Amino acid sequence: MKTLLLTLLVVTIVCLDLGYTLECHNQQSSQTPTTTGCSGGETNCYKKRWRDHRGYRTERGCGCPSVKNGIEINCCTTDRCNN
């Protein structure tokens, strides 16, 4: 009986997503879209945009960093929301 209960517990853990991980885009500027799973219970994705001598630059990733004046940042909370 204990073995059956242990087996059911293991199957439940394997079948359920107990550790949900947010997925964010992480490509830079106009590169081919790629994604990454965020670690440490991160709940935000970001898209940061600024202009330099090469034109507009874009950075994407996990989190919601603080930025300096002149840098546009958009933070969001759903999978792949920062494209």
UniProtKB/Swiss-Prot annotation:
GO terms for cellular component: extracellular region. Coiled coil: none annotated. Changing K68E: Decrease in the rate of isomerization reaction of disulfide bonds. PROSITE patterns: SNAKE_TOXIN. The record marks R54, R57 as: May be critical for toxicity. It is found in: Secreted. Keywords: Acetylcholine receptor inhibiting toxin, Disulfide bond, Ion channel impairing toxin, Neurotoxin, Pharmaceutical, Postsynaptic neurotoxin, Secreted, Signal, Toxin. Belongs to the three-finger toxin family. Short-chain subfamily. Type I alpha-neurotoxin sub-subfamily. This is Cobrotoxin. It comes from Naja atra (Chinese cobra).
